Amino acid sequence: MLRTCDITHIKNNYEAIIWKGERNCSTISTKYPNSAIFYKKRFIMLTPELGFAHSYNQQVKPLYTFCEKQRHLKNRKPLTILPSLTRKLQEMKFLPASDKSFESQYTEFLESFKILYREPLFLQIDGFIKDFRKWIKGEFNDFGDTRKIQLEPFQKNILIHVIFFIAVTKLPALANRVINYLTHVFDIEFVNESTLNTLKQKTNVFLVPRRHGKTWFIVPIISFLLKNIEGISIGYVAHQKHVSHFVMKEVEFKCRRMFPEKTITCLDNVITIDHQNIKSTALFASCYNTHSIRGQSFNLLIVDESHFIKKDAFSTILGFLPQASTKILFISSTNSGNHSTSFLMKLNNSPFEMLSVVSYVCEDHAHMLNERGNATACSCYRLHKPKFISINAEVKKTANLFLEGAFIHEIMGGATCNVINDVLITEQGQTEFEFFRYSTINKNLIPFLGKDLYVYLDPAYTGNRRASGTGIAAIGTYLDQYIVYGMEHYFLESLMTSSDTAIAECAAHMILSILDLHPFFTEVKIIIEGNSNQASAVKIACIIKENITANKSIQVTFFHTPDQNQIAQPFYLLGKEKKLAVEFFISNFNSGNIKASQELISFTIKITYDPVEYALEQIRNIHQISVNNYITYSAKKQACSDDLIIAIIMAIYVCSGNSSASFREI
């Protein structure tokens, strides 16, 4: 006979032993931070790492995030602390708390925190994440192949949606704690509360182009859920019987190969993994036999190729919506040429943000794929393409030869777009360019800045301010980004002045001012456009060099182009590369790779006018012109010229290219 207290003691010891190998051991410090506090109770907060502290520490985001992240790390590496900080910390003295009850409160609080790490369902979720991490690292591959698996963004999104919902429904009492843990595991601390609520909602729709690994990714999700989450019930519905049968056999094969120690059965389209006290099941059905899913209590229902599911079967699937513990994932490709097979796109207007669309073209530029013969990507180029996907002009031509419109409808993804919108510059890009500027005289930033200054000069020999002026732009690099150091939009005061001298002095004045503020530049590379007047371009180059070398000891080189006699001259002839330069600029601008310096130099733009805002006005005017299937770009509008923006675009384009051999001294 055992006494009750002995039974409890033995049970606790037994559980501690059997969980020892699997448990994600808590790294919470058990040492009581004994420090006195001198403020009211309502201002006190209690955390495992800080003990009793003032509640304003919750607003110190780096501190609070660091504490939470360290709390969830299993094997923490020793932290490296600067010696000066160590000395300062050692000098700090804390008075011990006089109230002994604080220590008992802290101990009780710590025990409540450790409940999560002892919760069996938490250990199951953690086991699922560990197995998935091993699979990504290639540890489950056959024949010694240890190559890592690279997940696409939409696949990561599906994984997070699945595990977040299961965590919330399986552990409702500890939902906030486990969600906090998962945000650290998946490294998504930056997401806000609204996004977290989206991850936890019951229904989500993923529309992804064909051949991108939708069905392939479902197999490991089902396999690892069956292995780790005890008692889970999964449903899988496909548009064809052979698809559901194939997925079922793949799941069975992977489970038997990866988990040979588990008891696995496959009978009547149901795969079962037998745990000690309960079974985990996955049922596979086609839309022609939805009777098998009626009356089930799924935790996860995956509807593959949802756009091609019979409408009668959809009624049965939607019957699971009222079930609070069921997550429904609609995953499908899109035939956007047919509204009957793209009806899920209507959810784009849903207030619940349940629709995620993967496409190679945004709605603003979908029409351009038809207008441009060889175009195969969105003109804003915010694109992530897997390495196993090849989309080029030949693929487009071949697809459209078989079936008119097949390229845009079957391959590119997205929805039928009847709205034509020629907006090339995104609002996000404009906002980032206007407000996020680097301080290029910051000593911590200087080591990462490029040591070459590129200056593009587009001269205009007219005094008509309504026509055009001289655009000058100075560009440098910061890692893979481009920084605007200076810009000028110069108009001749009158035709009586020497236009060559005035333009050259304006450019030299800007360059010298930039060099005064940024002495780290070792070379100035100047590009003078010679399309209007080659002789004047050569004269401008000579005057600029004379002005700079008289004031600064720095190497000055000019872009050289062979003339009719094959003699290299210091000017640049702008040709068809202007189109490529504009597209390169648009892609980098929209991706946030073009920034302005806080110490930007400009003498010709009014003091009351921010030069960056002045440049933005011209950037917003960039538009596409299509004439006889030939595409070009312009930023000219009725009351606005494009001289400055063309200079910026070309300076960035030349800076990005491998054109060092074309720069020579004169």
Curated annotation (Swiss-Prot):
Family: Belongs to the herpesviridae TRM3 protein family.
Oligomer and partners: Interacts with the terminase subunits TRM1 and TRM2. Interacts with portal protein.
E.C. number: 3.1.-.-
Chief subcellular location: host cell
Pfam family, one: DNA_pack_N
GO terms under cellular component: host cell nucleus
Described function: Component of the molecular motor that translocates viral genomic DNA in empty capsid during DNA packaging. Forms a tripartite terminase complex together with TRM1 and TRM2 in the host cytoplasm. Once the complex reaches the host nucleus, it interacts with the capsid portal vertex. This portal forms a ring in which genomic DNA is translocated into the capsid. TRM3 carries an RNase H-like nuclease activity that plays an important role for the cleavage of concatemeric viral DNA into unit length genomes.
Gene3D superfamilies: 3.30.420.320, P-loop containing nucleotide triphosphate hydrolases (3.40.50.300)
Any one of the GO BP annotations: chromosome organization
Keyword Hydrolase annotated: yes
Protein name: Tripartite terminase subunit 3
MF annotations from Gene Ontology: DNA binding; hydrolase activity
InterPro entries: DNA_pack_C (IPR003498), DNA_pack_C_sf (IPR038435), DNA_pack_N (IPR003499), HSV_TRM3 (IPR033663), P-loop_NTPase (IPR027417)
Keyword Hydrolase: yes
Species: Human herpesvirus 6B (strain Z29)
Location in the cell: Host nucleus
Disulfide bond sites: none
Keywords for this protein: DNA-binding, Host nucleus, Hydrolase, Viral genome packaging, Viral release from host cell
Motif Walker B motif per UniProt: ranges: 300-305
Extent of motif Walker A motif: 208-215
List of catalytic residues: E305 (for atpase activity), D458 (for nuclease activity), E529 (for nuclease activity), D643 (for nuclease activity)
